[in-house]
């Protein structure tokens, strides 16, 4: 009897009289989902530690022909193992986190919004992976080869780098290109919301290109080839974003009309 009373009290805390979830219920659901994501992250890090040596091998495969890797500080090698394992844990957690974000927001979304939300998360994940793969397969090998052998002279200088510097460069490039490849998706979202339009993107393209090259100069080694290799894809993606903005741009009036039509359809159902 006492157990049934406790269950009813807990249910009353979570669900309101009209069947909707209370603030306490939402907070409990959010807490549970955060705990699940945290557990997945911890498990991912622990499992990745067992394969940290293989992960380091994958990273260093791009530069082994051009560099000799050394560990300068006593803790340097161990710290890179931890860094790579933590990054692998994040990679494993991101799809799970995306799912729980969608599941948490789904009750408050319309059918069309729910479908668009799922599409955005899926495309975002795919584009980020494509950006990282582009950096790993194309950009990084060329950059490492150029930085090592592109300048003639001083042949007595050995091309040696610390494992920390190398891992820093790799992870920085992966994150940059992963984020840069999200540009078309961000443009689609903002254009669909009516915040930006193709005319605006065309007007500011000169400023945008200057900013792109400035960012490339900050995040890459100080040589023009590396800067152009980073800035080139960013400029190309910017012009692709202009094209996509022209397809998906909708003024606010159109969005309001669509919302009204969706509401009418739901009332009829």
Where are the language model's segments positioned?
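Membrane topogenic/interface segments and analogous intrinsically disordered interaction regions
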Residues: 1-269
């Amino acid at each position: 009897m006492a157990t049934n009373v406790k269950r009813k009290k807990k249910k009353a805390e979570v669900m309101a009289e009209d069947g909707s979830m209370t603030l306490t219920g939402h907070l409990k659901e959010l807490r549970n989902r955060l705990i699940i994501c945290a557990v997945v992250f911890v498990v991912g890090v622990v499992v990745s530690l067992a394969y940290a040596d293989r992960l380091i091998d994958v990273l260093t495969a791009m530069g082994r022909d051009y560099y000799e890797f050394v560990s300068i500080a006593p803790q340097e090698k161990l710290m890179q193992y931890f860094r790579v394992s933590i990054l692998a844990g994040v990679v494993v957690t991101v799809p799970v986190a995306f799912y729980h974000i969608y599941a948490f927001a789904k009750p408050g979304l319309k059918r069309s919004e729910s479908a668009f939300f799922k599409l955005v998360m899926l495309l975002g994940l795919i584009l980020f992976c494509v950006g990282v793969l582009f950096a790993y397969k194309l950009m990084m090998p060329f950059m490492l080869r150029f930085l090592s052998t592109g300048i003639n002279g001083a042949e007595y200088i050995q091309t040696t780098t610390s494992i920390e510097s190398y891992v820093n460069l790799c992870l920085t490039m992966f994150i940059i290109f992963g984020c840069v490849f999200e540009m078309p998706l961000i443009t689609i979202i903002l254009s669909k919301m009516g915040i930006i339009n193709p005319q605006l993107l065309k007007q500011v393209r000169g400023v945008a290109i200057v900013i792109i090259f400035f960012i490339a100069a900050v995040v890459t080694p100080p040589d023009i080839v590396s800067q152009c290799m980073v800035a080139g894809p960013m400029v190309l993606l910017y012009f692709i974003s202009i094209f996509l903005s022209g397809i998906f741009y909708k003024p606010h009036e159109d969005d309001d009309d669509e919302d009204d039509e969706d509401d009418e359809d739901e009332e009829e159902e």
